Every structure is written in structure tokens, then in C-alpha cells.
Amino acid sequence: MSGGHQLQLAVLWPWLLMATLHAGFGHTGRVLAAAVESERSAEQKAVIRVIPLKMDPTGKLNLTLEGVFAGVAEVTPAEGKLMQSHPLYLCNASDDDNLEPGFISIVKLESPRRAPRPCLSLASKARMAGERGANAVLFDITEDRSAAEQLQQPLGLTKPVVLIWGSDAAKLMEFVYKNRKAYVWIELKEPPAGANYDVWILLTVVGTVFVIILASVLRIRCRPHHSRPDPLQQRTARAISQLATRRYQAGCRRARAEWPDSGSSCSSTPVCAICLEEFSEGQELRVISCLHEFHRTCVDPWLYQHRTCPLCMFNIVEGDSFSQAPAASPSYQEPGRRLHLIRQHPGHAHYHLPSAYLLGPSRTSVARTPRPRPFLPSQEPSMGSRHQRLPRTSHLRAPEEQQHLAVSPHPYAQGWGLNRLRCTSQHPAACPVALRRARPHESSGSGESYCTERSGYLADGPASDSSSGPCHGSSSDSVVNCTDVSLQGIHGSSSTFRSSLSSDFDPLVYCSPEGDLQGKGIQPSVTSRPRSLDSVVPRGETQVSSHIHYHRHRHHHYKRQFQWHGRKPGPETGIPQSMPAASHTQLEPSLPDQQLITPNPTASSMLPNPQRPRALTEPAPGLAEASSPSPSPKPNPSGLLNLQKSSLTVRHPHRKRRGGPSEPLPTSLPPDLTVHTACPVFPHYSPRLAYPWPPEVHPLMFRPPGPDRRLLHEVPGPCYSSSQPVWLYLNPCQPLGPCLPGEGHSKWTFDSPEGRRCPYSHCQVLPAQPGSEEELEELCEQAV
């Protein structure tokens, strides 16, 4: 039954009770009323005792009669000798009879039919009797009952008037008729003692019950309606009661050891984030499940109202931690999203992570789903329908493909410090990269845990001065790269030129979701450097480039300590017109003719602008693989010596320049490019290759052993693909092999400790082309 029905019943049931009492005690009520009326009349009754003057030893002649006092006279007791009087006697005013006063006169009234016209009224006769010396008058109204009404009108007579009728009147008249002398006492009849008590007791009980019922009704109606306690409030109170509390102690190190990710910091005095007051000795602190500490008096009201941590929004009721929330909505992993981080120092990206991200991955080999980093996504302005990109996820390899990947380490790979690099993929999206969580020493000490990753890109801004030469980052960042500022990182546009600086993500920030390795026994050991998302185009995508409007930063220092042999073909440089702006990988013409002339319509159809030559280009990722006549081609030793790299990276004493991959021109591609080279592996998806940056942004730099040798993780595998721009130190050396007619020898080789030359397509250099340093500087300035 609802509360409204209960209230209505509470209001109505007193009235129902009263009706029940009236129905049950109706007869009793009427009897009670009659009793009260009789008691009222009883007070007017008189007791008439008649005692004969002659003593009767038996007492049978003694009479006790009842009568009623008339209203015309006073109700008082009286006594005297009994004397009969005729009605007509009382009409005579003469005093012929000398009667002794003090007698009781009895008058028997006749029927009104016999005396229609009485001489005097009954009241007058009663006065007349009193005047003649009677102490009281007794009227027998047996034959005239109307006399009672006549005698009820009060006239103020001093002598009492008593009315008798019936049997009592007959007994008295019989005594008179026998001429017996008697003495009469008229007394007031006392009412019974218990009658009034019973009535008042009943009235008291009924009144008490009624009062109790009325009080109950008023209490129910006037009581405030308190709603049931909210279950969520109960859960919140229970969760707050289960939170830990502690007394603050000045020893910061011990406190930090107990709470590694607490809101306090050893670098400064801990402060309550709510009241902004420093913790003092002995204060009671509330420690939330996320290990943030506040004054108990400050945070408890907040927790009761919001149920979340004021800093990290950890829900104390639901238990949704900071690391679990992004897993449900990894919207920032979608294409066209930009990640916003706090940039506090040049060359570093600082982002806030919970303690779970600082503990490192599990040592087990069980594969888990990647946990993304908690950042705020925003839509990239330049992303359109034709810029949709496939999610960069790892793909499992079929067992039959893995059988062709077990090759021995190549000696050249060993010379580069990659003696454990293995060929694990033939698809650009097939090899996930080992991960690394933030090192504890890279976290800040401002009270929260911040992971400092090397961003690899330093834009012009208040915190950086690119005109001062090398980048001035923090002392711990030894690999900060100085590059031109790309407007694609701010506005975004579309063109056919692809650069490693154009990315779906913020150019100032490199970050990505973390996940465990999918290989067996693979454990991350070094940090991961972010890669540009435009540096690699997956195989299944349309190779649509993003236009890069390079801002001419004249203040950038382009040193002239390196050489560039040739900038464009034509009569000025002496290069044949058939050669492209940047040479592509060529194989020795010893393969079958049908392989040399096999067209590649897929690769050609994906080139948006084949008429525009590029200064820095390299083969598209899918050319060699799409044109391969066999699933696992064998390398050509003689052709490997003549492979040439299309993107040349030079050694600069102060900064390292970037080169972006671009699509080759179908009109200028030599037929040798259609031949499947040896082991076309795409390194940024290899599960055996671990870069010091998260997998979302893979390395833009791949360097041999040197000052930054720590950035490269040595993993097995002899192969490396040309689908990713590679940055290497180059030194003048002898050409790798015989040159074709009209081509000069390459004067650049890799700066490896052993002096080995890389035989693969991504490691080769451009052919020697004439050109001056001024042209090279102009080329670098325009970046076209």
C-alpha cells in the first residue's frame, strides 16, 4: 500500500470508529439519556411514609409511598397529621373550622368532566391550603392527569406540593377511607449513588479514546515526510568510511615511500589541493584510493557530493581508475585525432600518467589488449573523407608465411648493431613494436607522475629558439631534432607531397597507447620514440598525401658542411632527362625480361601527381611487394650491390635533417623497381624490433652505433624495408658497385664501426649528381 493511501486511511479511520461506536452503543446511549432524565425527575420525587397513630406491632399498616414534587412550590420535606380535604372545601374562603395548623392535606381530584368549571385553579387551591395551616398538600391525580401540567408552572409557593397517582394513591385513600389516623412524613427521595458514577466513567472512557485517536491523526498528518535514504548516498558514505587516513609527518621521503604516487612531492612542501594550505605536522589526511592526499576536513564534503577525487576524478564508489576509463572510450586512437599534452620544456612532451604506467609491463608473455594513454582528443581540422586512415593495429601472420622468415642474421645488420633483427613481416601493418613504459627517473616531482618522452620535434615558439643553432632542450634529451616548422601541424592541407612532419597527430607531441607484446618472451627494455604517422602508408590504404606548406624559416641554420650531387635533371647538371629528381632503387639487369617490364597498375593508380618530380623521394611501400611474382623471392647478390637509396640523409654536425617519404613517379620509375627485392620487410611493424618510443609513432631516425646507440634496441633479423625513411650517418666512400652509363659513383656510405655497406634498398644512396652547395641550401629552404 502506498504512502498516499495510508495517509487517507489515517484521516478517515477516526470517523469510522465513531460511527462504529454509535452503531454499537446506540441503544446504550438512549438508555443513558433516559436514565439521566429519570435522575433529573428523581430529584423531584418524594417519599411519603404513612404511620398510623395506633401502634401496630406487626407493622403491616405502615405505608411507604412515592410521589412527585410539583413545580409550583418549593421542594422541601414536610410532616404532619394526615387530613383529607375536599376540593370544594378549598374553594370556600370562610374560616368556620378552627383547624390546628401543621397538618398534611390530601386532596383527591375529580375528573374534569364532572367539574368542567372549577372554582379555583389547582395552584390557587394549594395556596389556600397553605394559608389554612397545612404544611404540605398531596394531590391524587389518578383521574385527572392534566393536573400535573398545571402544577409545573412555578409560582413560588412555600409549602411543598406532591403529586401521587396509581396504586400509591389508592393505598393512601383506602387508609383515609377507614378513618384511621396517621402521621405522614414527606421526604426527598435521594438518587442512587452509583448511577452517576457509571455514566461519567463511560463518558470518560469514550472521551479518552476519541482524544487518543485525534492526537494520532494529527501526528500522522503533521509529521514531515522523510524520503528513504538514497542507496547511492549510502554507498558513498560506506566508501568514504573505508578510505585510509593518516597523520601527516614532516618526513617526506618516508611518506613518498609509502605513497609513491601521492599528491605530495619531495621537491616542495606538500599542499592540499582544495584549501591550498601546506600540510602541517600531525594533521589528519584522507588518502583516496588513487593515492592522492588531502585534508580530511576539506575532501570529505567534496567526496560526499561528487564521489570523485578532486585531482584525477577517480570514482571512489564505482572504482573506475584512471587507467580503466580510457579503455572504454579510446576515441583518441581513431584516425583524425590530435593528442594534446602539456609542453613544459623544449623537446619534451610531458603527460600525466597514473602509477600503473610507471611500474612497467608484466614480465609474462601473455598478450593483452593495448591500454591507451589518457589524453584529450580533438578533431584534426584537415581531415576529410578522403583522408580516412586505417587503424594502426598489428596483424597476425599466417603460419605458412612465418616459415619464410627464419633467415640468418646478415653481416651488415650485425655491423649496424642490429644483429638480432629478423625478417618477420611482409606487410607494413604486420609487426607490432615493443613497448616501454616511462622510467621512474623521467617523472617530474611536482606531486603527480609525469612521463617525459623525447618528442623529436621542436617548433618555433616562446620556449625554443631555432635561430640559435642546435636545439636547446633539457640536458637529458640528447636526440632532439631541429626541423623546419610545418604548417600542417597547425592548419593542415592536402597535396601530393608527403613528409614525416605531416601527421594525424599534433606535431608537438608524440604519444600512443601502450600494450603488451604479442611475441613470446619479448620484453621492452628501452623507451620508444614516436614515429610520424605519415611516414608509412599501410598496404591496404590509398596513398593520398597531405600537402605540406613549408614555412620558410630563414633563421634556421642550414650548414654547408655536406655535399649534394645534383638537384634536378636537365642540361644544367648533365643528367639525362629520363632520370627522376631522386633516383630509385635499381637492380642489376640480370633478371628475366618479363620481370623487368611487368607493370604495376596498383602502385601507379595510387600516385596522385605523377607529373611533379620530387627532390627527395623513395619507393612506395607497396611497389616491391605488389610486383613480386613469387611469395618468397630469393635475394640477388649481384643486384644487391647496385641497390641505391632514394632518400639521402646527410651528416650534420649540429642538427639532423628529416626526409619524408613520397610516392615515386610512374613515368620515371625504372623497370627494375618492379622486381621483388630480397626480404622486403617493413621495420616499424616488426614485433622483434623495439624502438624507444610508443608504437603509435615509430622512429623517424635509425642510426648506427654512436652517441645515441642507446636509442636502438638490438633485435634479430637481417632485413629492413625501404618503406620507412631512414636516417643514417653517411661518409664519403667508394661506390658500392659498378655504375650504369651516365651515372656517377656514390660518394657516401654508412658510418658504421666496421665500415660495412648496407646492400639493401633503404640503405643505398643517390647516384652522384652534380650540384653546388648553394643549390642544395636553396633546395633545403624550399623543401619541395
From Swiss-Prot:
Residues 583-608 have a biased composition (Polar residues). Glycans are attached at residues 62, 92. It is a single-pass type I membrane protein. Pathway: Protein modification; protein ubiquitination. Disulfide bonds join 91-119. The chain crosses the membrane at residues 198-218. Residues 464-478, 618-629 have a biased composition (Low complexity). It is found in: Cell membrane; Endoplasmic reticulum membrane; Nucleus envelope. Belongs to the ZNRF3 family. This is E3 ubiquitin-protein ligase RNF43.
